[in-house]
Amino acid sequence: MNNSTNNKLRDFYILWSTQSLSQLGSAMTAFALTLWLYEKTGSALSTAALTICSYAPYVIMSIFAGALTDRFNKKATMLVCDTLAALCTLIVLILYKTDSLMMWHLYAINAFSGLMNTVQQPASEVTMTLIVPKDSYQKISGLNSLTRSLVSVLNPLLASALYAFSGLGSVIAVDLGSFVLAFIGLAGFIRIPEQPKEVKESTLELAKGGLRFLKKTPMVFSLIIFLSGVNLIASAFNATLPAYVIPNPKGGSNMLGIVTSAAGVAMVLGSILVTVMPKPKDRVKVVFVTMLISLGTENYILAFSREPVLWCIAEIIGWILVPVMSANLDVILRNTIPVDLQGRVYACRNTFQFFTIPIGLFLGGVMVDNVCEPFMATHEYSELLTMLFGSGKGSGAALMMLILGVAGTLHCLVFGSILRKYHYKDT
């Protein structure tokens, strides 16, 4: 890359590196709070509610958050949201240090922090568009995927180690320190060009503008709906995986960590691949094909295998292409959506593409506990089912993996017939 391009990417590298550290700190706190709450309650439902509280504002309020992003200064929006979220974390630390921290405190604080993230995220997306040259979109998408991958690998390892060594307070302190670095980087070193404020519409009208754009751009909307189905299946998979690995004679909680880490490593490799791969001839096709490969291989391998090595291989195959898909989708969105509309359109995308995640988590758990496991228990003497899925607890989860594999394959093939009429090539 030449010096001119490097100079243009200076602001991005500062923003990316400092925000990545802040994301790692936040993820560590979330993981440590899960450990702390489970120790206090012994309830999986209470810890799951932490995620629900932080995720609900993201799904419900995203459309309006995007409208606010397009109305206000991007840097100020990010700084205010990050600061308020950090204050929430500080409140948790104070309550913890004074032995006053209660479960409902965490739920309320998580909901407010989730709301701040809902507003901050589209502002951050638009900022990336404004400070990055158009021909570098694929590269920065790969780096953003790399961040998400590294955070998913590192945060449970670092948080659990620090939590065991010195407690919840030290994890929160690291999080607050990472916030300070991110705040200084954004406030003092990042120059974000602001778009002229031409519109004087209400926030509701601005939100409707995002929906109108999606209605007029069927390629973008079709991709979003396609990926909402992918997220439904992937989140059901996430709910099924622990029930598949932990009861297995060769599994257990430690093996679940290894298998999960294999997915994170695969995403790191995929993110590196994105940064060096050439521009594809048709990015829409890449989005479709990568998901067909991911959903059409991983679940089948897991359904019919009993060896941890094969589980890890399945995770690698299933996740290594996810950053490739994300990068190509990101380039399509950044180049297709006008900058002055990106905040509200990204927010609409967040609502439509991600609302299926909590639904998938719920359905996956219900299917395993109430359908698949009881079915396998009542057919434990069936030689065919035992040969295919094993026996005992966990065999129902293996059956669920097959169901998810079939559902994922059918979803990709059905939507493939829709997506084939759309093509996107960089100009």
Question: What are these language model-derived features?
Answer:
Residues 1-12, 191-225:
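Juxtamembrane intracellular "pre-TM" segments in multi-pass secondary transporters
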Residues 38, 91-96, 113, 186, ...:
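MFS-fold secondary transporters
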Residues 13-31, 51-69, 73-88, 105-164, ...:
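Substrate-agnostic recognition of the 12-TM MFS/MFS-like secondary transporter fold
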Residues 29-32, 36, 41-48, 142, ...:
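Small-residue hotspots at the loop-to-helix junctions and early N-terminal turns
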Residues 60, 71, 77, 208, ...:
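C-terminal transmembrane bundle of multi-pass solute transporters/carriers
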Residues 83-100, 293-306:
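C-terminal ends and interior cores of transmembrane alpha-helices
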Residues 34-40, 93-98, 154-174, 247-248, ...:
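Transmembrane alpha-helix termini and helix-breaking/packing motifs in multi-pass membrane transporters
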Residues 99, 126, 130, 172-202, ...:
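Helix-loop junctions on the cytosolic side of multi-pass membrane transporters
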